């Protein structure tokens, strides 16, 4: 994994992610590099490589790092794009690794204008996915989304709209369950 301190093209990143297919040790090294290096460019490239791994490789080899990646994503002074790290977590989120702290972080920072729009939209997307595992949290997400009603940036508008679809479907399922009782 030399040259990760240099700026890589998308083609190079995709090629590196393909080289790592079914390489548990190599993927583990990339995860460790992303989480532990002080060099922002190396961490960014490592995160980008992890993002482009196949779904199978992520599930098998990146999932064990979920808690470390989640903790890292919630650091106040993250030295790479938070949205990129959150996009990795979105694909890894399951009912088994649900973290209330991460959900709360997403809600709190999704309305924080100090965060980039891409990070905020990824927080909304991740929170919506997490609500699928714990439907009782849909009302909290809806309250957060209400605060974003007048946001004008396309990424946040789209993330909000898609998250509201999740909230509405969860509410509909909840109403159907109540009617059966």
Predicted regions and their residues:
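Alpha-helical scaffold domains
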Residues: 1-181
């Amino acid at each position: 994994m030399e040259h990760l301190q240099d700026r890589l093209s998308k083609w190079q990143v995709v090629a590196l992610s393909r080289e790592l297919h079914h390489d548990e040790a190599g993927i583990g090294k990339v995860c460790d590099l992303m989480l532990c290096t002080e060099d922002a460019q190396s961490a960014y490239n490592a995160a980008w490589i992890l993002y482009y791994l196949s779904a199978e490789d992520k599930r098998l080899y990146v999932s064990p790092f979920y808690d470390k990646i989640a903790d890292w994503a919630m650091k106040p002074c993250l030295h790479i794009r938070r949205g990129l790290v959150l996009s990795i977590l979105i694909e890894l989120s399951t009912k088994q690794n649900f973290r209330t702290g991460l959900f709360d972080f997403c809600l709190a920072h999704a309305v924080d204008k100090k965060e980039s729009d891409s990070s905020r939209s990824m927080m909304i997307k991740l929170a919506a996915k997490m609500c699928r595992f714990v439907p009782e949290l849909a009302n909290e997400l809806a309250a957060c989304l209400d605060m974003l009603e007048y946001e004008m940036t396309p990424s946040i508008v789209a993330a909000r709209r898609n998250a509201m679809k999740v909230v509405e479907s969860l509410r509909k399922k909840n109403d159907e369950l109540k009617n059966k009782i």
